[in-house]
Curated annotation (Swiss-Prot):
Record's protein name: NAD(P)H-quinone oxidoreductase subunit 3, chloroplastic
PANTHER family associated with the record: NADH-UBIQUINONE OXIDOREDUCTASE CHAIN 3
GO biological process terms held by the UniProt record: photosynthesis, light reaction
Membrane topology: Multi-pass membrane protein
Membrane-traversing stretches: 2-22, 64-84, 88-108
Top EC class, one word: translocase
Subunit note: NDH is composed of at least 16 different subunits, 5 of which are encoded in the nucleus.
Catalytic activity reported: a plastoquinone + NADH + (n+1) H(+)(in) = a plastoquinol + NAD(+) + n H(+)(out); a plastoquinone + NADPH + (n+1) H(+)(in) = a plastoquinol + NADP(+) + n H(+)(out)
Keyword Chloroplast: yes
Organism, as annotated: Oenothera argillicola (Appalachian evening primrose)
Length: 120
């Protein structure tokens, strides 16, 4: 028999954890000043006035390295529990993990051929 009162704590937690942030945003919106002075509209760089043009564009060269790192970091997170329970899971899960690693290796080869791993 399915009893709904077993989930009362869950629903109370869900409602309270949803209402508190909404109330915080509403109250801060009511109490915050609406006029924006020149200090609010100026650029801010480490507590000092910016020298020159504050909207200078620059290229980030290592973002592809960071993306490839994140992909393989997530791979490690997925494969670690699998490696710990390898003897229990069986051959079918081993084949699934090999397919997962193969897809990631194909992604690495693609990134390598596109030049994502070159620092230029």
């Amino acid at each position: 028999m399915f009893l709904l009162y077993e989930y009362d704590i869950f629903w109370a937690f869900l409602i309270i954890s949803s209402v508190i942030p909404i109330l915080a945003f509403r109250i801060s919106g009511l109490l915050a000043p609406t006029s924006k002075g020149p200090e609010k509209l100026s650029s801010y760089e480490s507590g000092i006035e910016p020298m020159g043009d504050a909207w200078l564009q620059f290229r980030i060269r290592y973002y592809m390295f960071a993306l490839v790192f994140v992909v393989f970091d997530v791979e490690t997170i997925f494969l670690y529990p699998w490696a710990l329970s390898f003897d229990i899971l069986g051959v079918s899960v081993f084949i699934e993990a090999l397919i997962f690693v193969l897809i990631l290796v194909l992604g690495l080869v693609y990134a390598w051929r596109k030049g994502a791993l070159e620092w230029s």
